[in-house]
Amino acid sequence: MSAKKSYLKVWRGLAGAAGSCARVFSKKSLARRDRRDQLPFALFLFGLVGAVFQWFLYGNWLSGIVSEYTVAAFFGGFSIVLPILLIGFSIWLFRNPQKTHDNIRVSIGLFMFSSFSAAFLHFSAGFPYPSSGIRILSTAGGIIGWLVGLPLTTLPSYLAKTVCIIFIVLSVSVISKTPISKIVRVIFRYAKWLFNSDSVKTSPNSSVSSSSEHQELTGRDMPDTAGDNRHDETVTVLSGTSLTGSPVSEYRGESSDYALPSLDILNSYPPVKHDDAENEKVITALSGVLRQFSVNARFSGFSRGPTVTQYELELGEGVKVERIIALTKNISYAVASDKVSILSPIPGKSAIGIEIPNKKRELVALGSVLQSIHPDAHPMTVGLGKDSSGGFVLTNLTTMPHLLVAGATGSGKSSFVNSMITSILLRAHPSQVRLVLIDPKRVELAIYSGVPHLITPIVTDPKKASEVLQWVVKEMERRYDDLASFGFRHIDDFNLAVRAKKIASDSRELTPYPYLLVIVDELADLMLVAAKDVEESIVRITQLARASGIHIVLATQRPSVNVVTGLIKANVPSRLAFAVSSLVDSRVILDRPGAEKLVGQGDGLFLPISAGKPIRIQSSWVTENEILRVVEYVKSQAHPDYYVLEVQNQGNIDSHIGDDMPLLLKATELVINSQLGSTSMLQRKLRVGFAKAGRLMDLMESMGIVGPGQGSKAREVLVTPQDLDSTLARISASVSDSKLD
């Protein structure tokens, strides 16, 4: 009896060791109680023994006899492939023992694939019957091939083989959960490549097409929800479309010598080793809460992300989801954390997710995220970071099409903006993407000054920021005029036609339009100075600019209703919320609670346009030294080509000043020297009434000397004392010119 127990102990130990090896590179950790390693270990051994006999001892008389009367007797010539299927299926079971439905599906698919492959071989060998002898059967399709093919013997051989091929394709669809249409497309594409290789080699799009089809086969088009198969995928693609689109080379204009920076310019960090003991303690504490309140539920596993670990809880029969949600405070008490979030259900699973912050957080380096982006991906593709299961999260800014970012101080909002801009600098040519950076805080984006992607110097003056946004609106209208004139609906189609020289203009030379990305680092400062003008421009851009290739990212520390107005929210469909201070702020940015429970430092909730629920991510991190290296590199490749932004002032200079000209000049000199735009000060110093002082202040506002009124506060003076003489000369000249007109 003791010997039997010893054998069982050794067997379990070997199975556990094999399972641990199979799970080394898995993104998902498994609790010990959920591991089922003995069955997959047995399959692995069968596959290993089969590989030895079928491959390495091929031609040996003993190997031939053993194979002939065992596996080859059942599957015939297909038995040479069976070791691969057995070993692959065993690794799948090692990693996913709790996915009962998926395991049954894969088992059925593999059996279908093996059976109909054997039947196809049996028809190819002339369909011998068992009476022909075991030796002939083992060289054809075996007993399985004969049984499966027997109902098809009434058909001609070529039709029977066609039916077998159809079922083989169907089995691949069952195994991979991929639509048959995509599998057929891939088969035809490779068949075309095989029989027409010369034409494919000369096609400039062949490599992109094959990579695109590979993404279709593996299911990496944009998933409807971020949770589908997240443990099986290392990359999650968000925001509506696949990232590949057109290759980078199609976006480059006539520019030539510019070379994109290598990703080696960014820092590399060693992978973090996780300790499952900490997660086991949490599961023990959570299980204690369930027992204490008599809740029939069990934990089926956990997924460790960089910031939080998601524990999967399967409910027993008759247990309401509301019971788990009602225990949130008790769970927080048990794990000693006030940042517990409950996801009910986990998208794509019949399980509840309990997200608990890790005691030791993982740094998500921007370099590692960008390494996961396909080289031919869209130039506006950026790496957001990692999700709660540890998979990389990517998004295409053109499909968002606009983004609203909010978070309190220290939440990681500015770090995300830096990562996004750095991603663009690393992956996009200046002729592909141009940037408009608006930084009212003056210090956040100053590091990017002089990069060739800028279309105008970094804007730090809120008053000028309003004018720049008006210029963006005019640029959008110019692009739409071209689209309408030449009959295109999107700027990409227009650019392709221009590069192919399919269209031309008599009045000017047509050139491709670059994407224009507008980034506002602090929306609240702009809304404080010129709320009406800023909101009007932002709403125009967000309503209409998508097809013209113009996209805007709005970031703010204060997601209050007077900053993020209803019109702005309605037209900016994608949201990214970092940690905020209150439930009210979370509802403003996401229209739901959740952001108030984030732990800060890059922990965020991303709600793309195509997702029903926000996805928890850890934003990627890039250091200031890395940014400096990237900026210095791109500045060494090209110089910025600034546009002249011609924007007409909202106010009109009143030329009918009459006898007030001397007073206006005195008022201008007084305001600029004192740097105080106060109407009451003009009343006292110039000894004029309130109406006259107010008129003088309005005239100075129309001339860009002072900013708009701010209630009882003094107006901001926009001209420095060093520019006093030139300003006085400009006033005199403008009034004289208007009189001549």
UniProtKB/Swiss-Prot annotation:
Asked if the keyword Oxidoreductase belongs to this entry, the reply reads no
Q: Mind listing the GO biological process terms from this record?
A: cell division; chromosome segregation
Q: How does it sit in the membrane?
A: Multi-pass membrane protein
Q: Where is the protein found, in the record's own terms?
A: Cell membrane
FtsK domain residues are 390-587
- Sequence intervals crossing the membrane: 39-59, 74-94, 108-128, 136-156, 163-183
Q: State the family it belongs to.
A: Belongs to the FtsK/SpoIIIE/SftA family.
Domain comment from the record reads as follows:
Consists of an N-terminal domain, which is sufficient for the localization to the septal ring and is required for cell division, followed by a linker domain, and a C-terminal domain, which forms the translocation motor involved in chromosome segregation. The C-terminal domain can be further subdivided into alpha, beta and gamma subdomains. The alpha and beta subdomains form the DNA pump, and the gamma subdomain is a regulatory subdomain.
Give any Gene Ontology cellular component: plasma membrane
Provide any one GO MF term from the record: DNA binding
Superkingdom of this entry's organism? Bacteria
Q: Which InterPro entries match?
A: AAA+_ATPase, FtsK/SpoIIIE/SftA, FtsK_alpha, FtsK_dom, Ftsk_gamma, P-loop_NTPase, WH-like_DNA-bd_sf, WH_DNA-bd_sf
Amino acid composition bias (Basic and acidic residues), ranges on this chain: 213-232
Q: Which Gene3D superfamilies match?
A: 3.30.980.40, P-loop containing nucleotide triphosphate hydrolases, Winged helix-like DNA-binding domain superfamily/Winged helix DNA-binding domain
**Lineage per the UniProt record:** Bacteria, Bacillati, Actinomycetota, Actinomycetes, Micrococcales
Q: Where is the composition biased (Low complexity)?
A: 200-212
| Source species of the chain | Tropheryma whipplei (strain TW08/27)
Task: Decide whether keyword Cell division is in the record.
Answer: yes
What's the name of the protein? DNA translocase FtsK
- List residues binding ATP: 410-415
